[in-house]
Structures are given as C-alpha cells and as structure tokens.
C-alpha cells in the first residue's frame, strides 16, 4: 500500500499543470550538444575523486554492517502534501501535517524530534511545552548556530529556546565538529574554535520524529516553511524497534 501511495503521489505531481518539461523551459538542444553532454558524463563517471571513493567505501561498510542485524518488518504509511498546497487550495486531508498526526496520534509517553531547521512558532512551542508539562518526555535535536547553514533560521528558533527549556522540553544542538581537549592561544583568546585541519565541519540534515513507537522519516522540517509552503513527503512506520 505504501508503494502504491508513493507512486500515486509522484504521478499527481508529474501530471500537474504546474509541472513543466525541460524543453518547455530551456528549449531543445542539437544532436551535437547531446553528444557532447553524453561524452562529458561518461568522462565524469570514470573520473572518481577521493570523496566519491570514500563514499563508495562507506557504502560497502554500511552494507556489510547491515547484514549482521535482522530485518524488522513493520507496517508503513506513505504520506505527502498534495500539489494543491502550492496553490493554497489543499483540503485538510491533503496536508502532510494532518495525515501525520492522524496516523501517529497525540504523544502520551514520549516524543523525540530531529529537525535540521527547527522553528516551532508560538503554536508549536505551546504544543511541545504542554506535552512536557503534562508528563510526556519531549526531546528535540536541531542544528547549533555554528552548524546551521541558514543563520536566520537559528535566529527565529532562538527566541523559543528559553521558554521550551523552562517548560521541561529537552533541547540538544548539533555541533559541527568534535570538541578537543587542548586549544590554541588564539582559540582561548577569541572563543573561536578552528576545526581540525583537513576535516570539514558537519551539519544535521535529518528530519524524523518518534511518537510512542511510531516513527516519521521524511523531508518535513519542524518549521513554517515545511508546514505552509513546501510540498513534503515521508513515511510513518509503526515500529517500536525503529
């Protein structure tokens, strides 16, 4: 059923009036241009850089590790916004937020929320605070200022932080690099920590949350943009193990 729903959602976007083919947008290329493009991609595929080699190695290691663990089969539901959301014409049942909470229900025991961009708004902050005050364990992980690639998002999130903490919500912020035990004189003097040489900083990109053994994994950030502007998709999986 989840696969059928995913296919149906894809086709609804593919066939929508707001979807355009590439030739409609940029015109058609010549046969010579197509041949050059094909040659470029073939050469690029053969020229693997160091990062791609590391990714391939990591994939092999992950595949090997996964074979050591049993597969936990569980019921899953594919949910998504309708293309009508873009026009402001979506019915309540065509909005992913309503679908999500219809399936997952109101948290009673616990809620773990991971969101790269976390801007709860007043309504969202009140919702999470009331859960925590009524005995539900609420934990949130989002990017720290240093890890966030959109500083203004952190600025909007920051104004809700104190209130959430005071109401019992547990907040965690992702660090872009691992702290060291020793710092240079410059870092001590300025408070600006320089990442280890050769290691780029990291940021949180995942979006998922768990409500009493039901897990959502998808593209939805806990922010107004995902709720009201973007069209988002995801899976709700009924699994205590997950």
Task: Label each region the model flagged.
Residues 1-242:
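Charged, low-complexity intrinsically disordered terminal segments
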């Amino acid at each position: 059923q989840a696969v059928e729903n995913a296919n149906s959602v894809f086709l609804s976007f593919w066939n929508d009036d707001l979807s355009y083919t590439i030739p409609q947008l940029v015109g058609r290329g010549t046969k010579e241009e197509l041949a050059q493009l094909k040659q470029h991609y073939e050469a690029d595929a053969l020229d693997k850089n160091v990062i791609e080699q590391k990714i391939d190695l990591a994939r092999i290691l992950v595949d090997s590790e996964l074979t050591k663990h049993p597969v936990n089969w569980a019921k899953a539901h594919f949910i998504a916004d309708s293309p009508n959301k873009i026009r402001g014409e979506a019915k309540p049942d065509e909005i992913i937020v309503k679908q999500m909470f219809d399936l997952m229900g109101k948290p009673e025991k616990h809620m773990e929320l991971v969101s790269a961009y976390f801007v709860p708004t007043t309504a969202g902050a009140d919702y999470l605070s009331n859960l925590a005050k009524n005995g539900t364990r609420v934990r949130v992980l989002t990017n720290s200022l240093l890890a966030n690639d959109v500083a203004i998002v952190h600025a909007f999130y920051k104004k809700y932080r104190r209130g959430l903490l005071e109401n019992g919500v547990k907040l965690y912020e992702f660090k872009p690099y691992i702290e060291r035990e020793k710092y240079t004189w410059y870092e001590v003097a300025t408070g600006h920590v320089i990442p280890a040489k050769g290691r780029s900083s990291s940021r949180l990109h995942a979006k998922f949350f768990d409500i009493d053994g039901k897990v959502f994994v998808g593209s939805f950030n806990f922010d107004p943009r995902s709720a009201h502007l973007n069209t988002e998709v995801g899976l709700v999986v009924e699994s205590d193990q997950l």
